[in-house]
Amino acid sequence: MAKEKQEEQQKQTAPENEKAPKKDIKKEASDKKGDQTSKLKEEIADLKKQLADKDDKYLRAEAEIQNMTNRFNKERAQILKYDGQDLAKSILPVLDNLKRALAIEVVDDNGKQLKKGIQMVHDHLVKALNDHGITEIKADGETFDPTLHQAVQTVPVEEGQKPETVVNVLQAGYQLKDRVLRPAMVVVAQ
């Protein structure tokens, strides 16, 4: 009988002993699961942050490329707009010399023929310059504009003249579209 009681006690304690480890195992599993979940959530948050950073960098790079493209196109348009500016500046003295040659009075037939040829060259050169957007700056009788005119001399205002008016052009000025190649050298009434 004592043996039976002992066995019975062992049976009763055994299930109690078995129950205790199951609770610990469940708790451990739950803790491990919670740790893994929090680690995964942290990893997901980190990956989301990295993705947001990459997206931001990508958008900034794309915007920078667009800005560079716009700047390049603008510079290219400026270059094309003012293409030939240096050539035009070097041709202007030739045009001045042709005008001086045309200002000379001739009396004989040979001189008149020569002057006619010079006039044709002058007209052709002016037309070619105009075709490329190079025009003479209007100055005589105009109000003095320091962006277009260079005053080399001033004279007192005479009757019928307005102050700050160009009364004489010493050397013609030229502009390429809206850019001044050479200001007109003028005499201004003051």
Swiss-Prot record:
<keyword id="KW-0346">Stress response</keyword>
<keyword id="KW-0143">Chaperone</keyword>
<protein>
    <recommendedName>
        <fullName>Protein GrpE</fullName>
    </recommendedName>
</protein>
<dbReference type="GO" id="GO:0000774">
    <property type="term" value="F:adenyl-nucleotide exchange factor activity"/>
</dbReference>
<dbReference type="InterPro" id="IPR000740">
    <property type="entry name" value="GrpE"/>
</dbReference>
<comment type="subunit">
    <text>Homodimer.</text>
</comment>
<comment type="similarity">
    <text>Belongs to the GrpE family.</text>
</comment>
<comment type="function">
    <text>Participates actively in the response to hyperosmotic and heat shock by preventing the aggregation of stress-denatured proteins, in association with DnaK and GrpE. It is the nucleotide exchange factor for DnaK and may function as a thermosensor. Unfolded proteins bind initially to DnaJ; upon interaction with the DnaJ-bound protein, DnaK hydrolyzes its bound ATP, resulting in the formation of a stable complex. GrpE releases ADP from DnaK; ATP binding to DnaK triggers the release of the substrate protein, thus completing the reaction cycle.</text>
</comment>
<dbReference type="GO" id="GO:0005737">
    <property type="term" value="C:cytoplasm"/>
</dbReference>
<keyword id="KW-0963">Cytoplasm</keyword>
<feature type="region of interest" description="Disordered">
    <location>
        <begin position="1"/>
        <end position="41"/>
    </location>
</feature>
<dbReference type="GO" id="GO:0042803">
    <property type="term" value="F:protein homodimerization activity"/>
</dbReference>
<dbReference type="GO" id="GO:0006457">
    <property type="term" value="P:protein folding"/>
</dbReference>
<dbReference type="GO" id="GO:0051087">
    <property type="term" value="F:protein-folding chaperone binding"/>
</dbReference>
<dbReference type="InterPro" id="IPR013805">
    <property type="entry name" value="GrpE_coiled_coil"/>
</dbReference>
<dbReference type="InterPro" id="IPR009012">
    <property type="entry name" value="GrpE_head"/>
</dbReference>
<dbReference type="Pfam" id="PF01025">
    <property type="entry name" value="GrpE"/>
</dbReference>
<dbReference type="GO" id="GO:0051082">
    <property type="term" value="F:unfolded protein binding"/>
</dbReference>
